[in-house]
Amino acid sequence: MPHHFAEIAFTSMVKKVQEEMGSRSSYARMESVPDSVNHRLTEAEAGFIAGRNSFYMATVSETGWPYIQHRGGPTGFVRILDENTIGFADFRGNRQYVSVGNLMNDDRVSLFFMDYPNKTRLKMFGRVRIVGLDEQAVLSRLEMSDYRARIERGFVILIEGFDWNCPQHIFERYMPEELSAVTAPLTARIAELEAALARAIESSPAK
């Protein structure tokens, strides 16, 4: 079974550049890994995606121009529908509809899921089916009941291939709640010491 991500990404021109730069042999081994299943999610990929609150999605217009969009929502807004399929609700944004328009012409997407604190990146190729508001059975699996945003449609993505990327040149970034988890013990300790100091000052004899 081929390495699905490499089969899509490593075109003849890409392989030519790999040859010129001396990396072709290592990627040839990657392509020849037996029983590759990198188009079906394991617990590792499913858990990683479920832990994200954003990702990047690339589409291509009918004129051939690529377009990258940031997609965000509550943690877990990208739903794992099965081992080959993910989906998410399309919340109303700036109403340019560039990605939606592109997908009506070409259903292929490239996705980047990022974990900045752990310098981890999951790349994915897929094909999108746009889900209308009349498909409530599907949309109900994509809704976030505790997130106040208007849903205009759903995206269901059939995974064609994925690959974990190296951590080089990914710089750590942290959400406020992630920083709070680290600084909370320090803040509590500072408050404790300040209170102890205040008591000591109050109990000390006046000069």
Residue ranges and their predicted role:
Residues M1-K207:
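Binding-site signature for planar aromatic cofactors or substrates
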